[in-house]
Amino acid sequence: MFDFFISLINSAIYGLYNVTVAIGFPSYALAIIFITIILKVLLYPLMAKQMKSMMNMQEVQPKLLDLQKKYANNPEKLNQEMAKLYKEYDVNPMAGCLPMLIQMPILIGLYTALREYQFEPIEHATFFWVNNLNAPDPFYILPILVGISMFLQQKASMGKNNEAMENNQMMKTMLYIMPPMMVFVCLALPAGLCLYWSIFSLLGIGQQMIMNKQKEKQMAIIEARRAEEAAKKAEEEEERKKRQ
């Protein structure tokens, strides 16, 4: 099954390389960039669904806190009510992991394919200072670019909640430990894979900025709903006191 996946990647590289030949700019590096753009477009619906699920999770947070207080001594009932609430608001707690789970086999497949790919002619398998996309970047520029672009993408994903997000231990790890670790890992990886990864992250920054604007609009709607619900509860409480 994995061999078929690698064969598919090889075919995509060769097919898109032929496209670059047809447009008069034969380049395997450009073919890899095309693959990156195509994958980013294909994965966008998952990213959008992830953002929607996160927004729904924020909307449902006050109700979750109420349930946790109500069923503090009944974990089984709490889990049942939380499941109902997630279903009602279309929340998937695992939605944030899905894009990464899909991305990992793609990275492994690209690593295997690029390590063994026979670039012909080899002079078309260059990228500025890189003489061979099969080999590691001799000047470590692409690995460093991977780290920087990953850091910036994580920063962009925090939106305007930087301080709150940075206080989260997991987010701290993702933001400050993962990028340097990826730089170290990428030092030994084929330059073609580092090119894919850095372009994917750079595109992700632009994508995240667009999604952040959508998120701000959605958050404004959520805050308006919360204010409306709070006003309604206060009104009901006032009526109850009057009846007493």
Language-model features, listed with the residues they occupy:
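Helix-loop-helix
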Residues: 1-244
